[in-house]
């Protein structure tokens, strides 16, 4: 193979790999990742149990469109008081509770 052929094959392989992973949102192990948009789009905020309870940042408050859980957590709404238990491996590309979520904690 000549250099042009090798570069072409590498380009095609990289392009195919990128397309195959478009639906696989990135979120580090030990975190919950929240997106403002559905289908893991828009701005992303990460939470880890080391943070204990946290109110979601203003732009995510009652405005989480999707999430990926790489740890266990409890999503909370304060008025009325509701919780949503989240387990490692859970995810949602269209998160209904995200319309009322106020915060996240390591326990319910």
Swiss-Prot record:
GO cellular component terms attached to this protein's record: extracellular region
Species of origin: Dictyostelium discoideum (Social amoeba)
Protein family: Belongs to the Dictyostelium gerABC family.
Subcellular location: Secreted
Major location (coarse): secreted
Alphabetical keyword list: Glycoprotein, Secreted, Signal
Protein name: Uncharacterized gerABC family protein DDB_G0291103
Record bears the keyword Glycoprotein: yes
